[in-house]
Design a protein with these regions (language model features):
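Central hydrophobic cores of alpha-helical transmembrane segments in multi-pass inner-membrane proteins
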Residues: 46-65, 113-117
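C-terminal transmembrane-bundle signature of multipass membrane proteins
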Residues: 199-243, 250-263
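Short, hydrophobic transmembrane alpha-helix segments
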Residues: 30-44
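Membrane-interface helix-loop-helix junctions at boundaries between adjacent transmembrane segments
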Residues: 72, 89-164
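Hydrophobic core segments of alpha-helical transmembrane domains in multi-pass membrane proteins
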Residues: 43-54, 101-111, 165-173, 212-224
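Long, contiguous internal "core" modules enriched in hydrophobic/ aromatic residues
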Residues: 128-207, 231
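N-terminal membrane topogenic signal
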Residues: 3-23
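A cytosolic-side transmembrane-helix exit/cap motif
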Residues: 62-70, 119-132, 211-214, 232-246
């Protein structure tokens, strides 16, 4: 067995709770729905307000950072025109082709979330063989959950009588896949990262409304994104501050010290 990767984004425990295995968030969401069914919309709103919207807004510092202005200016099609076109097409699709738009949105959302899950695995990878296994497992199960979502809510072929059998099959499939993976690589933390990436859309198999299938598991995606974005933002601020300190030096002496000597 190869040595396990010791990379840490923040520290061992923060990484585990918010990036590698943020399972607490969908559990809290599910328990809240079960114990407070009359407040379903409030629970959805709170989840979206506290995690989803900050996750969407976390992208904006990219456009506000002066260091990125040249990149944005040189690639206007990617960073300006395409987002505007997507917004307009989304508005048109939502009002005039709602069913197709929702299906397309579901597919893009799953692809985006799956890509991030694989990216998280790359951050903590121990070796290429393990990463290849993680990629195949994550993409496979998320593709299965996408098909289940279509067959449950878009083309309702899977009815309530089949839900129990479906979940038994999925649970056994996940269990044996994870078991084989763990015995092969024996890396507990990467094993938990794999579980996170593989089960994000598992709620689509048992929730009664598609919104819960999207929000419940994807809360883990939101926390991962926010944690990583904060780290990038914090590192960027640190680098900018270091540059300012270096620029504030005069013949190797900080300006403040120089002024004190002069006075």
């Amino acid at each position: 067995m190869e040595a396990q990767n010791k990379l840490q984004i923040f520290n061992k425990y923060f990484d585990l709770i918010f990036i590698k295995f943020p399972i607490a968030f969908p559990i809290i969401y599910g328990v809240a729905l079960y114990t407070l069914p009359g407040y379903e919309n409030v629970i959805i709103f709170i989840a979206l307000l506290t995690l989803a919207e900050p996750h969407f807004g976390a992208t904006w510092p990219f456009f506000l950072d002066k260091g990125n202005f040249a990149e944005i200016k040189n690639r206007k099609i990617r960073y300006i025109y395409m987002p505007i076109a997507i917004i307009l097409l989304s508005l048109i699709g939502f009002f005039y082709a709602n069913s197709f738009f929702l299906l397309f949105f579901f597919a893009i959302n799953m692809f985006h979330v799956t890509r991030q899950s694989y990216g998280i695995c790359k951050l903590y990878k121990s070796n290429e063989q393990e990463l290849n296994y993680q990629e195949k497992i994550i993409y496979f199960f998320n593709a299965v959950f996408f098909i289940v979502g279509i067959l449950r809510f878009y083309i309702p072929i899977i009815d309530q009588t089949s839900i129990f059998k479906l979940n038994i099959i999925m649970l056994f499939s996940l269990f044996f896949t994870f078991l084989l993976y763990y015995f092969k690589f024996k890396n507990l933390e990467n094993f938990l990262t794999l579980i996170t990436g593989s089960i994000i859309f598992f709620p689509i198999c048992f929730v009664d409304k598609p919104i819960h299938g999207i929000v419940m598991g994807v809360l883990m995606h939101y926390t991962q994104y926010l944690a990583l974005t904060y780290k990038v933002y914090d590192k960027r601020n640190y680098n900018n501050l270091s540059k300012q300190v270096n620029n504030a030096k005069f013949f190797g002496i900080k300006n403040s010290t120089f002024l004190i000597i002069v006075l």
